[in-house]
Amino acid sequence: MIPTADPILSFNPEALPPSALHMLSLSPKAMEKMSGISNPLVSPNAIPPRTSSTGIPTSLNATPTKPVLRPVPEGDWLSQKQLSPRAQMSNAGYGVMQAPNPPPDPERYAHEDLEFTAKRSWTDEKENVVRGPYDYVISHPGKDFRAQLIGAFNVWLDVPTSSLEVITRVVGMLHESSLLIDDVQDSSELRRGFPVAHNIFGVAQTINSGNYIYFVALQELHKLNNPELITIFSDELVNLHRGQGMDLFWCDTLTCPTEEDYLEMVGNKTGGLFRLGIKLMAAEANGPSPTDCVPLVNLIGLIFQIRDDYMNLSSKEYSHNKGMCEDLTEGKFSFPVIHSIRTNPTNLQLINILKQKTSDTQIKRYAVAYMESTGSFEYTRKVLSVLIERARKMAEELDQGRGSTKGIQKILDKMAIQ
C-alpha cells in the first residue's frame, strides 16, 4: 500500500478506475518506461511524500518508510529528454567551440611564405602598440622650446620649408623619446604634471618605444636624401648618450663632479639635441656658406640646463609638473648642488641627502635651506646672468647688423631669472 501523506484522506482502492489499478500493479521499471514515453519531462524518481519545513512527514501516524528516491543512471534520464530549439542551438554552438582542432601539419613550413615584411604584415594596430608610450608623452605637450629655437636660427640659415618641416619633426621626436628613457633611468614619477609613461605602460615597453622612435626619426631624415644629415644624426646621438652616461654614473656612485665636468656633460646631453637641429639646418641651408651658429647654440644649451637645475629646486611650477625638488629625490648633482657641496666639502649633510634619494618634503626643504646658506642659488643666478649676456653679444656678432636677432633675444629674455 502507498503511504498517505494526510490522515484526513483515506485510500479506497475500489473507488479507483481500472486504468489506475493497472498502473498501481506495474513494477517501478515498467512505470518508468511508460512515464518516459508519455511525458518526456517527467522526474526520474517518484515524488516523495509531503513533509513539513522540518522534514518530518505531516502525518503523525505515518510510519517510517524506506527512501522513495532511488539512483537512476544519468544516461537513462538524459536520454528521455528532448531539448528545446534554443537549448539545442546553444549547445550546438558550444560544441563547435570546444571541438578539438586537427593538429597543424609541420610540412606547411616547406612552402608557406615566411617573408613577414613591414608592407605585408605590419598594421596600424601593431604600430599603435609599439608607439603607445611615445604617443602618451606627446599627448601632454611641453613648451616646444626646440621648435622656437629652430625658428629663431632659421632667420640666418634660410632652410627650405620642406626640409625645415622634416628637421623640426625629427628634433621633436628625438626630444620626446629621450624623455621616455630619462624618466625610466631617473625613476621619475611625473612628467609635465602627469604620471610618467613607464608607470602606465611598464618599463620594458617604454624603453622599447623610446628606442623605436630614434630609428623612426632616422628614417625621416633619409627622406631628404642628404648623407651629411645621417652623419650629424649619429654623431650627436653618440654625444647625447655620453652625457647621459656620465650623469647617471655620478648619481650611482655618489661622485660629485667639478663644474667643468658638469659643463662638458651638459654640452653632450642637453646641448647635443640643440646642436643636432642647428647642424641639420646648416646642412640643408640655402647658399654655399651658412652662418656658423654652433657656438651660440652650445651656449644656449648650457643656459637652458643650468636654469632648469635652478628652477627644479625653487619653482612652484616645476614642483607641480615634476614633483618638489625632484633632482634631490633622483640624487642628481645639478649645478647648485655641485656648488654647495664644493663650497664646504667637510659638511657631508647634502651629499648624504642625495644618497638617500628621499621623497620626504621636510628633508628636501632642509637641503634647499642649506644650499641657500652656502650661497649656491645666488651663485647660479649670477652665472646665468653672465651667460645670457654673453649669448646676446654673440647673437649680435652673428647677425652683423642685419637686425635679425629678435627671435634669439626673445628666447634669452624667457630664460633670464628675475
From Swiss-Prot:
Stored InterPro entries: Isoprenoid_synthase_dom_sf, Polyprenyl_synt, Polyprenyl_synt_CS
Pfam families, alphabetized: polyprenyl_synt (PF00348)
Positions with biased composition (Polar residues): 51-64
Binding-site residues for Mg(2+) 1, renumbered to this chain: 182, 186
Keyword Magnesium appears in the UniProt entry: yes
Enzyme Commission numbers on file: 2.5.1.-, 2.5.1.1, 2.5.1.29, 2.5.1.10
An example Gene Ontology molecular-function term: dimethylallyltranstransferase activity
Positions with a binding annotation for isopentenyl diphosphate: 143, 146, 175, 192
Catalytic activity: isopentenyl diphosphate + dimethylallyl diphosphate = (2E)-geranyl diphosphate + diphosphate; isopentenyl diphosphate + (2E)-geranyl diphosphate = (2E,6E)-farnesyl diphosphate + diphosphate; isopentenyl diphosphate + (2E,6E)-farnesyl diphosphate = (2E,6E,10E)-geranylgeranyl diphosphate + diphosphate
Localisation: Cytoplasm
Record keyword Metal-binding present: yes
Positions bearing the site annotation: Important for determining product chain length: 214
Spans annotated as Disordered: 51-73
Main location: cytoplasm
Residues that coordinate or bind dimethylallyl diphosphate: 191, 269-270, 305, 322, 332
Example of a GO biological process term: geranyl diphosphate biosynthetic process
Entry GO CC: cytoplasm
Residues where Mg(2+) 2 binds: 182, 186
Family: Belongs to the FPP/GGPP synthase family.
UniProt-recorded name of the protein: Geranylgeranyl pyrophosphate synthase
Organism: Fusarium fujikuroi
Gene: GGS
